[in-house]
Amino acid sequence: MVKSSLQRILNSHCFAREKEGNKSTIMPAVLSLSTGQSSSRVPFNCCSNLGPGPRWCSDVPHPPLKIPGGRGNSQRDHNLSANLFYSDNRLNVTEELTSNNRTRILNVQSRLTDAKHISWRAVLNNNNLYIEIPSGALPEGSKDSFAVLLEFAEEQLQVDHVFICFHKNRDDRAALLRTFSFLGFEIVRPGHPLVPKRPDACFMAYTFERDSSEEE
């Protein structure tokens, strides 16, 4: 279970980064994934190279992908309304309405204190949750917020896999790879059916191990 590993990420230095330039979001590419692909316990055949970065993370720049009819520059489309998806004393999750009723765009806001909130953007697709690690310096408390998000994915969404994605040319890529590998995430091989074709992005996956009694 991911709970037993959460403390590892709480001490990670990857959540205190230097400021980076703006980069295009990866999430629009996730929306283009086929919803018919089975996701249950899929092997990822991950790469084991945790040096400067996997060879498949090419340095060739790629143009940003856009949601058809959308802005594609990390700004929310104002024509999309949002509905409350889930709420408790730590999380408030809203869902952006899309034309695809099998893919959900979730805006997750964690409440660390009454005055401090941290937001994450995720896509729920075919029992998998995709979370983009944003560029730039993350605010203080992001490590605790991410831990709460993982618990939400396991206990409330009951997904099979959690994917994280981040741009391969960020300065802290090697640190991110080490941190999430230690947490239990695996590097996803290129061309895997559960991730979009984005050679400019790195994807890692965590598979939840459930008892047979929980799956019945």
Swiss-Prot record:
GO terms for molecular function: ornithine decarboxylase inhibitor activity. InterPro entries: Acyl_CoA_acyltransferase, ODC_AZ, ODC_AZ_sf. It comes from the Eukaryota. One of its GO terms (biological process) is positive regulation of protein catabolic process. Pfam families: ODC_AZ (PF02100). One of its GO terms (cellular component) is nucleus. Interacts with ODC1 and thereby sterically blocks ODC homodimerization. PANTHER family: ORNITHINE DECARBOXYLASE ANTIZYME (PTHR10279), ORNITHINE DECARBOXYLASE ANTIZYME 1 (PTHR10279:SF8). Ornithine decarboxylase (ODC) antizyme protein that negatively regulates ODC activity and intracellular polyamine biosynthesis and uptake in response to increased intracellular polyamine levels. Binds to ODC monomers, inhibiting the assembly of the functional ODC homodimer, and targets the monomers for ubiquitin-independent proteolytic destruction by the 26S proteasome. Belongs to the ODC antizyme family. This is Ornithine decarboxylase antizyme 1. The gene is OAZ.
